[in-house]
């Protein structure tokens, strides 16, 4: 049985995320800063901004961009002062959301995808505490409406996706605060829209989003959905008890299951699954079952790795998986390097 980490059919993937900063010459580009920084980001990358400006009315688009750049500092400073965060380093840029089908005769009043994005280098806890309500009051609804409009325009190119629901949300991820838009369409379907003529994916460059960050989004989404979709104890008790002694106690403890995906110092991601079983005996038994159960899969993947590069990656991940925990708590930890994340992302898109 081959273990595959390819992610298919995952819904509610957050879109419209990219970092921002720079000056009038250099608009939004995302750059991970680690857990000690924070960013409010809406928009896409520099190439898309230039493309939209060119497709709009040339000089008029530049005039609007210059106006936004000129006025942004004062507006941002005002919000900073109201939030009591005068020491925050602020950068801004003109960005676009989505890839709307623009007609040559369309004026800027009909294009809500041009806006100002702001990057704040401050502690995420301060951002969440001081800015969340402020953002909702000052610009929340406007940004949400614009983001949704951009995403809807983007998915309108596919009849199936056109029917999918789109909803905006404020999201804290990897030490950053984002305004995101999510859709019920599958990751596979979304990625398919961004394949170029040679079958190679342009998804990450089009998103302006690093592969490792996209994978963290997906993994976090999976963890949340696994936790939410755990069956009620009475529905699965009989099945579990056939394989695990004292399974009734363990299944009742599944409500304490927690999954997290956080940024690692090397640019990778640290995955952690924690389950409070209620007793050290049950936790120890679960650790034993996990370790012995993984052994044959690891051996099989090692064998397959001799001829398959993808299997080699999975074999290394299985070996890196650490089963731990004490005092009635079961833990499974996996540190995935940045290079492996990118490799997995590339395999997902083939």
Language model features with spans:
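C-terminal motif of bacterial Sec signal peptides marking the signal peptidase cleavage site
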Residues: 16-19
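Long, low-complexity, Ser/Thr/Gly/Pro-rich intrinsically disordered segments that act as flexible linkers
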Residues: 23-150, 263, 329
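One face of beta-strands
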Residues: 38-42, 114-120, 215, 253-261, ...
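A cross-kingdom marker for long, charged
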Residues: 39, 264-267, 283, 304-350
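An internal, short helix-loop-strand segment that often contains or flanks glycine-aspartate motifs
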Residues: 49, 57-89, 93-94, 137-266, ...
